[in-house]
Regions:
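Conserved beta-strand hairpin/beta-sheet module of binuclear metal-dependent hydrolase folds
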Residues: 1-52, 146-162, 179
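Active-site neighborhood of phospho(di)ester-bond hydrolases with catalytic His/Asp-centered motifs
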Residues: 37-41, 58-64, 68, 96, ...
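Adenine-nucleotide cofactor-binding loop residues
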Residues: 41, 141, 165
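Active-site metal-binding motif and surrounding structural segment of the metallo-beta-lactamase
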Residues: 42-92
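Metal-dependent catalytic neighborhoods of phosphoester/phosphodiester hydrolases
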Residues: 72-80, 106, 225-233
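Metallo-beta-lactamase
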Residues: 86-146, 153-154
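Cap/insert and terminal regions of metallo-dependent hydrolase folds
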Residues: 166-250
Length: 252
């Protein structure tokens, strides 16, 4: 399984990165490569095209419906609907309840058909089996309906926190994960609003408790120093830590 960081800027695009978007690739037993995208935040579709033909994406999984995690689905809709090669078959898009309706509204489309001719929308209800992937969505703590994702393929595990406040759900998402991709939007030692995000210290603590083998710190807003988030995580996690950066590739 391979993870490519497409966008990792927290809350809005930064000068060096779009908002949240991650490309995951894995081969099935026949050698076919399956490609899924986790989130499609502001500016992500442009950068995604550096690494893959968007028409080769097999599915998209949206962690929650804040713009920095989903709004470029409106651009992806245009790409699939009006591509010169002709209309594309709908691909699966998984997300919280109301994902299809919200995205149609964002592009000022009528509720029916909305984007249903391009995307086959499904609400998170349980485990998802797709090609070589077994994906387990788990509700996390955020001001809106939000999910973290545990992705298993070929004996490897990738945990993705999505956006979340402190919650033991992260322990299930990251349990014994080969790689834990975890947000750290807040700084330690300041009066952060409750129920929204976590700090680098928290990310490290969850990685430690979950016995994750490697921690990738992501979703740091441009107004914060990302190096601080990594330093915080190092104070609570002794394993390998890296800061997510656009274009970085990890073999999980």
């Amino acid at each position: 399984m391979r993870l490519t960081i497409i966008g990792c800027s927290g809350s809005y695009p930064g000068p060096d990165s779009p908002a949240s978007c991650y490309l995951v690739e894995a081969d099935d037993s026949t050698g076919r490569t399956w490609r899924i995208v986790l989130d499609m935040g502001n500016g992500a579709l442009g950068v995604l095209q550096r690494y893959v033909d968007p028409l080769l994406i097999d599915a998209v999984l949206i962690s929650h419906l804040h713009a920095d995690h989903c709004v470029d689905m409106t651009s992806y809709y245009v790409l699939r609907k009006w591509h010169p090669t002709g209309p594309q078959p709908p691909i699966p898009v998984y997300g919280p309840k109301g994902t299809g309706r919200r995205l149609a509204k964002a592009y000022d489309l009528p509720k029916r058909p909305g984007m249903r001719e391009e995307f086959a929308f499904s609400t998170y209800t349980g485990q998802i089996n797709l090609g070589p992937y077994r994906i387990t969505p788990t509700a996390v703590e955020h001001p809106v309906d939000a999910y973290g994702l545990r992705i298993e393929a070929n004996g490897k595990v990738l945990g993705y926190s999505g956006d979340t406040a402190e919650t033991d759900a992260l322990l299930d998402i990251a349990a014994d994960a080969d790689l834990f991709l975890c947000e750290a939007a807040f700084r330690d030692g300041v009066d952060n609003p409750p129920g929204v995000h976590i700090t680098g210290v928290h990310a490290g603590e969850y990685a430690t408790k979950a016995r994750a083998k490697k921690l990738i710190v992501t979703h740091v807003p441009p107004w914060h120093d990302s190096a601080d988030a990594v330093r915080e995580a190092r104070s609570s996690y002794e394993g390998p830590i890296e800061l997510a950066a656009t274009g970085a590739v990890y073999e999980v």
